């Protein structure tokens, strides 16, 4: 088998893993269906645009290109199946960027920050509208999001964001009383919170499958089980796979955590794991708990807890901070059952003791691409005909719609609001070379974990842990 450059798996390994969808999580096992219109790429081909990566970003980019320039020949290649990476393994949170407004404002100023955040609200609705055309039920439930605090140190984590929006005469979040938070989330573990309407829970793998069908129907050529093994920077560039090649006028890199195989991006982000579980259906228990079905809930820690009750009585529950990977090489570390299964179960039962009686249907892991400032970035990779973007930092379901708009405009050389967007920039921050990055990152992650455990226990974290925690990049919610 031909070894994929910079990675720890072969094409044969990839195909073998696809035969066991539950190894990649409950969502994928539930949603994935074969499609004979997405064959392995064999031989050479030409395209106007070649997109590498069949997750949300790649699929939205393809759809946007077809919307702006319908005659453009778009070819998309995917190493496994569309949605087999983070797009099919996440918590099913279709969120906006309003909670990151302070980061956006710092990056590009208030007017552009407002434009991007408002567009991210529209993006959530767009997911539902586009996927309706596929005939696939993506389980879209628009019940909003409660951003909570679970200990006194998290109280007011949202206040600076609310103050900044109030200064701009913009109201997005509604403050809730402690009783309202406990009543709506079904647990007294949450002691405060604010509510953002318009956000939705969904079945993430089904969403990727729906986008794949819509893209095929609109003329996008998709080849699955066709991982890129080399990007030849010739004129024009050539993307090589194990059994074929594509010569394209433009190449879009939409590989997210798998971008570590490219020198341009290898040191521009951190790969950090997330662990999730799905319970068996227990509608009676869920009714007794009292959590609103479809309501998104997450707390204010760096190693965030995030969860929602599904309409069928299941609980989807996740926690950030799993396996940390040296060199941003994903390999097979995120395949199979979660290595942190007991850890994530104990977190679930802290919130919902009644769920101890409910069997767990599956546990799994996924890779998260964290940028150094918590926001995605989109850039040209040393030349105008190769572009890429990543760094959603745990919030990619909704914002990837915007990522598709940005990358499509860049690929088509359009001068518009998206190609000039504030998120079009050089990768932020600085990461030291390996092995310093892995050692330093591991120390920071352990410090964050110790700090948050101490806060949960009502104790003061050590001064060293506080200092190291400040070095961690933002995750789902902003940090001080």
Regions found by a protein language model. Name each.
Residues 13-31, 100-106, 129-210:
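Flavin (FAD/FMN) cofactor-binding and adjacent substrate-gating region
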Residues 163-166, 189-249:
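Helical element adjacent to the flavin cofactor pocket in flavoenzyme catalytic cores
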Residues 4-49, 67-68, 72-73, 99, ...:
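Extreme N-terminal leader/targeting segments of oxidoreductases
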Residues 92, 125, 133-141, 228-230, ...:
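Active-site substrate-recognition segment that forms the wall
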Residues 53-57, 79:
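Glycine-rich Rossmann-fold phosphate-binding loop(s) that bind the pyrophosphate
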Residues 66-89:
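Glycine-rich FAD pyrophosphate-binding loop
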Residues 410-445:
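Active-site-proximal substrate-binding core of FAD-dependent oxidoreductases
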């Amino acid at each position: 088998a031909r070894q994929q450059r910079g990675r720890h798996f072969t094409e044969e390994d990839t195909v073998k893993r696809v035969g066991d969808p539950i190894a990649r999580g409950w969502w994928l096992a539930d949603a994935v269906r074969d499609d004979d219109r997405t064959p392995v790429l064999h031989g050479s081909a030409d395209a106007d645009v070649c997109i590498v990566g069949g997750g949300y970003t790649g699929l939205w980019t393809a759809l946007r290109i077809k919307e702006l320039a319908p005659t453009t020949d778009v070819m998309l290649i995917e190493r496994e199946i569309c949605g087999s990476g983070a797009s099919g393994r996440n918590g099913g949170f279709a969120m906006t960027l309003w909670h990151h407004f302070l980061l956006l404002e710092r990056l590009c100023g208030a007017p552009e920050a407002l434009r991007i955040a408002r567009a991210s609200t529209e993006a959530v609705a767009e997911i539902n509208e586009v996927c309706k055309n596929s005939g696939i039920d993506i389980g879209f439930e628009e019940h909003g999001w409660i951003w909570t605090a679970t200990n006194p140190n998290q109280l007011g984590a949202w206040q600076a964001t609310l103050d900044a929006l109030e200064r701009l005469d913009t109201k997005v979040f509604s403050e809730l009383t402690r009783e309202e938070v406990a009543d709506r989330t079904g647990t007294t573990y949450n002691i405060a919170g604010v509510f953002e309407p318009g956000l939705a829970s969904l079945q993430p793998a089904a969403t990727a499958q729906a986008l794949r069908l819509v893209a095929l129907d609109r003329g996008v050529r998709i080849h699955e089980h066709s991982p890129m093994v080399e990007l030849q920077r010739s004129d024009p560039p050539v993307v090589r796979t194990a059994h074929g090649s594509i010569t394209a006028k433009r190449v879009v890199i939409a590989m997210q955590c798998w971008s570590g195989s490219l020198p341009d991006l290898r040191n521009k982000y951190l790969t950090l794991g997330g662990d999730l579980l799905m319970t068996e259906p227990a509608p009676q228990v869920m009714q007794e708990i009292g959590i609103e079905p479809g309501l998104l809930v997450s707390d204010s820690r760096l190693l965030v807890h995030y969860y929602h009750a599904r309409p069928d009585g299941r609980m989807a529950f996740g926690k950030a901070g799993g396996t940390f990977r040296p060199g941003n090489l994903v390999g097979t570390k995120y395949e199979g059952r979660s290595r942190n299964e007991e850890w994530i179960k104990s977190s679930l039962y802290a919130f919902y003791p009644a769920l101890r009686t409910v069997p767990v249907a599956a546990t799994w892991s996924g890779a998260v691409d964290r940028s150094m400032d918590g926001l995605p970035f989109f850039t040209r990779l040393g030349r105008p005909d190769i572009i890429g973007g990543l760094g959603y930092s745990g919030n990619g379901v909704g914002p990837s719609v915007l990522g598709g708009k940005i990358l499509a405009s860049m690929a088509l050389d359009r001068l518009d609001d998206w190609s000039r967007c504030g998120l079009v920039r050089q990768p932020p921050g600085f990461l030291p070379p390996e092995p310093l990055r892995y050692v330093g990152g591991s120390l920071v992650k352990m410090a964050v974990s110790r700090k948050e455990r101490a806060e949960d226990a009502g104790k003061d974290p050590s001064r060293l842990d506080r200092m190291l925690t400040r070095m961690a990049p933002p995750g789902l919610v902003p940090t001080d």
